[in-house]
Amino acid sequence: RTSWPELVGVSAEEARKIKEEMPEAEIQVVPQDSFVTADYKFQRVRLYVDESNKVVRAAPIG
């Protein structure tokens, strides 16, 4: 699996359930308009959140 589109609209804390499917995941919560590095990491999942800490786009691996 490479993304979790069903997490859009849920809180970042609730979205951390990704760990149930991917225990090795390194979860990063970042504001939706933040600049992030372009490097690719197989274990990293970024949760892009709005000001109310809700996920605003599908959480991709990378």
UniProtKB/Swiss-Prot annotation:
Annotated keywords: Protease inhibitor, Serine protease inhibitor
PROSITE patterns associated with the record: POTATO_INHIBITOR
Protein name: Subtilisin inhibitor
Keyword match Mitochondrion: no
Xref: InterPro entries: Prot_inh_pot1, Prot_inh_pot1_sf
Site (Reactive bond): 38-39
GO annotation (BP), single: response to wounding
Similarity comment: family membership: Belongs to the protease inhibitor I13 (potato type I serine protease inhibitor) family.
GO molecular function: serine-type endopeptidase inhibitor activity
